[in-house]
Design a protein with these regions (language model features):
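N-terminal export signals
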Residues: 1-23
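Metallo-beta-lactamase
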Residues: 22-31, 125-174, 179, 188-189, ...
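Conserved beta-strand hairpin/beta-sheet module of binuclear metal-dependent hydrolase folds
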Residues: 31-84, 184-196
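Active-site neighborhood of phospho(di)ester-bond hydrolases with catalytic His/Asp-centered motifs
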Residues: 69-71, 95-102, 118-120, 194-196, ...
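Active-site HxH/HxHxD metal-binding segment of metal-dependent hydrolases
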Residues: 78-79, 83-161
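Active-site-proximal loop/helix segments of hydrolase catalytic cores
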Residues: 169-225
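Divalent-metal (often Zn2+) His-rich catalytic cores of metallo-beta-lactamase-fold enzymes
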Residues: 214-271, 275
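C-terminal regulatory/interaction regions
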Residues: 265-315
Length: 315
């Protein structure tokens, strides 16, 4: 299905932009493992005040060059990221991985040669289908932050199970659930799992393209990996390696149960977005916001499932 601008705006439910303001990205990498830095995105929704820089990004130093996992929301961010990363390592960026189609993770690839940008085939297909709608929406929401940003597609399809960079080896895992094509990476040198948006930590999971059963299957796969820490797509670094996995699963399980109960109780969409959120999620950023977004994503399907038309047989 082709994504229209109206559908894009409704699905993302992003807040309106503010007026003109300073549009300089301030990027502060923090070392989390040997030769790996994390850039912690804003845990808020996409907004003019943060320039759309809400996704976490990894910088990885290897003997042969610098690797990036995700690239931010705009050309301006991508250029700033490139300068910061190369300043840290003293080596050029030789690979940029895009974990999935969403624009907070992938529009920054406009700053790089497509030949060094890698993504799963499904993610590239999704970006080709929806990318212009994403770009149009972000231009309208973020204004000057997006100036010069054009849709760029990754030039390298990930089909191999790993990639080696001068002895630093990354395991590449093709998964799904947050989107139809979710890339997760395991740095074998340190045991760090980079989960993309399959993992949220102390930040409510976003669901605009989610398939919850497939997401659970992917989380099960990640939990079995020989990793010791996790860098989620959103939220703080997880030094345990398992907390982000468990927390993400807990939220999507509760979400599905809560919305199903709301439909079966006859609540409308506004009422469903106001149901109580369990106390265990009290410290989770953007919880009410993501609940309300998820209502718009899932409610029509749940209503069709649980409230069938009287003139149609069930089952």
């Amino acid at each position: 299905m082709k994504m229209t601008r109206r559908a894009m705006l409704a699905g993302l439910a992003l807040p309106a932009t503010a007026g003109m303001a300073n549009t300089t990205y301030l990027i502060h990498p923090v070392a989390v493992e040997d030769g790996i830095w994390m850039i912690h995105g804003d845990d808020a929704p996409i907004h003019f005040s943060n320039g759309g820089a809400i996704a976490n990004i990894a910088i990885i130093d290897t003997p042969v060059g610098t690797l990036l996992v995700d690239s931010g929301p705009s050309l301006r961010y991508g250029r700033t990221l490139k300068a910061v990363a190369e300043g840290l390592t003293g080596k050029p960026v030789i690979r940029v991985y895009v974990t999935h189609l969403h624009p907070d993770h992938g529009m920054g690839i406009a700053a790089f040669d497509p030949a060094i940008i890698a993504a799963l085939p499904q993610a590239i297909t999704d970006m080709a289908r929806d990318g212009r709608g994403f770009s149009d929406a972000l231009y309208r929401l973020l204004g000057d932050w997006m100036r010069g940003t054009e849709l760029v597609l990754p030039g390298r399809k990930i089909t191999e199970a790993s990639e080696d960079f001068g002895g630093r080896r990354l395991r590449l895992m093709a998964l799904a659930g947050h989107s139809a094509g979710d890339l997760a990476l395991l740095d074998e040198q340190t045991g760090l799992l980079i989960g993309g948006d399959l993992l949220f930590h102390d930040r409510a999971p976003a669901t605009p393209t989610a398939d919850l059963p497939r997401w659970r299957t992917s989380l099960d796969s990640l939990a079995k990996l020989p990793h010791r820490a996790a860098l989620p797509g959103h939220g703080p670094f997880d030094p345990t390696g398992q907390e982000a996995i468990a927390q993400t699963r807990d939220w999507i399980d509760w979400l599905e149960d809560a919305l199903t109960a709301a439909v079966r109780s006859g609540l409308d969409m506004v009422e469903a977005g106001s149901v109580p959120i369990p106390a265990r999620f009290a410290g989770m950023a953007a919880a009410r916001y993501e609940l309300q977004r998820s209502v718009s994503h899932f409610y029509p399907g749940l209503e069709a499932k649980w409230l069938p038309r009287v003139d149609m047989p069930e089952g």
